Amino acid sequence: MVKKYLVTTALQETWPSSQSQIIFLGEWCKLYSNKSYWNNLNYEVIDYHWDNREKFEIIGISFNSKKDQTKERLIAAFDKFIDVQNKSNDEIVYLSKNLNVDIAIDLMGYTQKSRFAIFEKRCAPIQINFLGFPGTTASKNMDYIIADKCTINDNEIVNYSEKIIYLPISFMATDSKRRPSKKLFDYKNYEFPYESIILCCFNKYYKITPEIFNIWCNILLKFKKTILWLGKDNHAGIQNLTKELKKKGINENRLFIAKFETKIEDHLARIKLADLCLDTYPYCSHSTAYDYLVSGIPLVTLKGNSFSSKVSSSMLESLNLHDLITNSYTEYENKISELISSPEKIIELKKNIEKNKYKSTLFNI
């Protein structure tokens, strides 16, 4: 893929820097806790390069290398792993050049505590934006972005400063070992009312806009057996959401906050309790969409025009679940209502997801 998309003319003289024809691939990342999307879903992006170690040397550059058991697996996948947390941007650029890094892949973009100045200073002849920042960096020094035809269609290429490297079907990377455990959860674990219809969203609260929450409230008012199951985030967010429910005349006991699960496999297993997962907009589910689908639960999404609003749609398309993709607030609310009104459709969707998910390209890196 790299050979197909050559570096700019100004940089061609410096690439490749190694006479041994080994390509050095710098993975520039910040290692978070074991809940981190990158840690949990991208092991095999690195692991599968072991089949090409005569062509690639994989170097991990971390801005925060606090270790736990989850990270140990990731670190072990690299040929070299270097903690640069206490180094300056100039020192990191110097290190990269000293390591003869030919390709640097940025996994953070402009997200919190990123070090994008490193890429502005040109730490490698080829620099690629992947996964961490779902959109253009608008930087002349970021050469490429990895995407698919859903997240960046032909008409949108003009909006990107980067050249587009298209992956087939979906650009999302996954981990075949990230699967639900065999642990059984039931309504009693969360004190859900018997025969309730569980609507789930485990996105961070900052993604829940007033427009989306208003639609969820409309659904709760329309279907009396529905409850809303959210992930645990900040206390102020829970208070604000509860306040909004009360304003609309909805009993706060229909809002349930998930307990923290230490094992990701158990977290995925409990998602199976949900009847339907609801997406946010305009910043939709990314790693959480993967979690819903690998757990076998359908997700209704609202597809927008930005990269960040189309990641869920990309994954749903890879599973041929086009009917779960909506294009307006009205369509979104109507689709949720339609499925709740026809529980047999939800059952059929769950069966189809379970039957086809491991055959799809999404779950086959």
Residues of each region from the PLM?
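Conserved donor-binding/catalytic core segment of Leloir-type glycosyltransferases
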Residues: 5-7, 193-209, 213
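C-terminal terminal-structure detector
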Residues: 164-172
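Short hydrophobic signal-anchor/transmembrane segments that target glycosyltransferases
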Residues: 45-52, 199, 210-224
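Conserved nucleotide-cofactor-binding alpha/beta core module
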Residues: 8-141, 149-157, 229-363
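Acidic anion/phosphate-binding donor-loop and adjacent secondary structure
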Residues: 153-159, 172-189
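Nucleotide-sugar donor-binding and catalytic loop/hinge architecture
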Residues: 2-4, 180-199
